[in-house]
Amino acid sequence: GSASAPSIFPLVSCENSNPTSTVAMGCLARDFLPGSITFSWKYEBLSAINSTRGFPSVLRGGKYVATSQVFLPSVDIIQGTDEHIVCKVRHSBGBKQKBVPLPVMLTLPPEVSGFIPPRDAFFGBPRKSQLICQASGFSPRQVWSLRDGKQIESGVTTNEVZAZAKZSGPTTYKVTSMLTIQEDAWLSQSVFTCKVEHRGLTFQQNASSMCTSDQPVGISIFTIPPSFASIFNTKSAKLSCLVTDLATYDSVTISWTREENGALKTHTNISESHPNGTFSAMGEATVCVEEWESGEQFTCTVTHTDLPSVLKQTISRPKGVAVHMPSVYVLPPSREQLDLRESATLSCLVTGYSPPDVFVQWVQKGQPVPPDSYVTSAPMPEPQAPGLYFAHSILTVSEEEWNAGETYTCVVAHESLPNRVTERSVDKSTGKPTLYNVSLVLSDTAGZCY
């Protein structure tokens, strides 16, 4: 065949960010005649690269193919400024050259996190636990040291660096180090420092048993009033007192008292340990609806060994709240939905009411519909009426039930309503809301209050 100049293609290696290794790149020349060819490699500044390896030309389909490889230390790529190197080819039918891009060594700094032990996590004799330090999200993968401050030599276990699991984006790495500490050293308010060095920079995280800006700022107390829905359903008022950021739970006490007659029976529940190593506790007491609605004040008192003095918070029914009765509308399923012969969706709109606390329930054949058959929105402000609220409830039934003529009733309870309750019903025959008295269904749950 006639003489033919080569076509040149770069061959780029995968990233290898181990600074002690080398990265191989290559240059492919193809479709040339005659078969004699010479490769050379240069940096961007045209200085020669000598660590090369050539392969003999191979005849394929009447023309020749040849490759050349070059080897560069990873550390040169990590720390160098070149973005490519140059592959030059000399051939009797014409010289050519091609830029071969260097692998991109993405640099991402580590995020260093410390995880402190909860107070109940110390075991044994002497009592011990672990501080955990994790560096994550960094690239390349080398971390020059991971150590705890004051150059602690014993009790430190550092895992291997590992790639973080992710579906997309650049590969990043993480490493975890554990330091075994004794309880008396931890409680002596020593500061432990985890230091991570990456690409010549030092990142660190402090940990101690003292309160710091990234640890809980102290025990907090929140009183929660009874909701109208719970008052309506149980015919009693439940007072709740939430205590958060407890380092330990064994010494916490929560008690409810009232203005008159003193102490209330208080039931306390303790949470599981939270991710930040703290606990929370809930103290609940029950009073009569009339007592709550009278405006009487109730006080939650909290004691704990970490508190210099008791915490108290008082709650009572808000006074002077504007009260507006809701308008209630029940809408039948749309004709388009029924034509699909699958399901029927009924809507109950509750509009223009205040305060926002409301209770909505669906009733069929005189019995409450199971709660998993309908969904009720949270109260939302009326867009055109400041201070008023609306909510809606959606009930889904089978198309057969609707077409059989079943009657469905939306029951709405709100403190502004006569007898606290109103209802609207709809069925296939009317296609529009009708009144249907179901108040007795719900009032049967009334309990005695002593």
Curated annotation (Swiss-Prot):
SUPFAM superfamilies for this protein: Immunoglobulin
Keywords: Immunoglobulin domain
PROSITE patterns in the record: IG_LIKE, IG_MHC
Gene Ontology cellular component list: immunoglobulin complex, circulating
InterPro entries given in the database record: Ig-like_dom, Ig-like_dom_sf, Ig-like_fold, Ig/MHC_CS, Ig_C1-set, Immune_Resp_Modulators
Molecular functions (GO terms): antigen binding; immunoglobulin receptor binding
Any single Pfam family the record assigns to this protein: C1-set
Cystine pairs: none
Alphabetical GO biological process terms: antibacterial humoral response; complement activation, classical pathway
PANTHER family in the cross-refs: TAPASIN
Protein name: Ig mu chain C region
